[in-house]
From Swiss-Prot:
The name this protein goes by in its record: Transmembrane protein 9B
Top-level taxonomy: Eukaryota, Metazoa, Chordata, Craniata, Vertebrata
GO cellular component, one term: lysosomal membrane
UniProt PTM comment: N-glycosylated.
Gene Ontology BP term (one): positive regulation of canonical NF-kappaB signal transduction
Modified positions (Phosphoserine) in chain numbering: S142, S189
Gene: TMEM9B
InterPro entries to which the protein is assigned, alphabetical: TMEM9/TMEM9B (IPR008853)
PANTHER family given in the database record: TRANSMEMBRANE PROTEIN 9 FAMILY MEMBER, TRANSMEMBRANE PROTEIN 9B
Family to which this protein belongs: Belongs to the TMEM9 family.
Keyword field contains Signal: yes
Length: 198
């Protein structure tokens, strides 16, 4: 049992370290992306015009200067076509908070790591809990094999005890046991007593 807990702790620390490493890599990529685009920018989307292809221009300027003449550099057209070209461009002033984005991603990855750790914990510990809490399964099977008129008398006591436990695993086990009892009762009524299912 001690080696199992030691293994779980090592697995948990390994998962935490991998989640932390993933967070650091993601933050590094976000900081690289932040170098390309600041938190405040003006973005102009210009469609194709004559022989010039469409293009997207980004520039870190104030909101009052967010127009085609200040953002589009170098200007792809000359002379009188500049005004016609700029009328086609759609410029938007954008603000974002990269700190909020980073914090949100860290929280998301932390929750994901905790859920993964919890899943591994349940996967490894569930068989031990089943053996300890529901070791009475052989008793129910032996009563059923004998053909007693009340084969589930002990099962009702066990189910009543499991009902008092408040964790999710016991509630699921209780629902499974209750369903199995109903199925067995229906089988008994159909095959032994030849009664149609209700």
């Amino acid at each position: 049992m001690a080696t199992l807990w030691g293994g779980l702790l090592r697995l948990g620390s390994l998962l935490s370290l991998s989640c932390l490493a993933l967070s650091v890599l993601l933050l590094a990529q976000l900081s690289d992306a932040a170098k390309n685009f600041e938190d405040v920018r003006c973005k102009c989307i210009c469609p194709p015009y004559k022989e010039n292809s469409g293009h997207i221009y980004n520039k870190n300027i104030s909101q009052k200067d967010c127009d085609c003449l200040h953002v589009v550099e170098p200007m792809p057209v000359r002379g009188p076509d500049v005004e016609a070209y700029c009328l086609r461009c759609e410029c938007k002033y954008e603000e974002r908070s990269s700190v909020t984005i980073k914090v949100t991603i860290i929280i998301y990855l932390s929750i994901l790591g905790l859920l993964l750790l919890y899943m591994v914990y349940l996967t490894l510990v569930e068989p031990i809990l089943k053996r300890r809490l529901f070791g009475h399964a052989q008793l129910i099977q032996s009563d059923d094999d004998i053909g007693d008129h009340q084969p589930f008398a002990n099962a009702h006591d066990v189910l009543a005890r499991s009902r008092s436990r408040a964790n999710v695993l016991n509630k699921v086990e209780y629902a499974q046991q209750r369903w199995k009892l109903q199925v067995q009762e229906q089988r008994k009524s159909v095959f032994d007593r030849h009664v149609v299912l209700s």
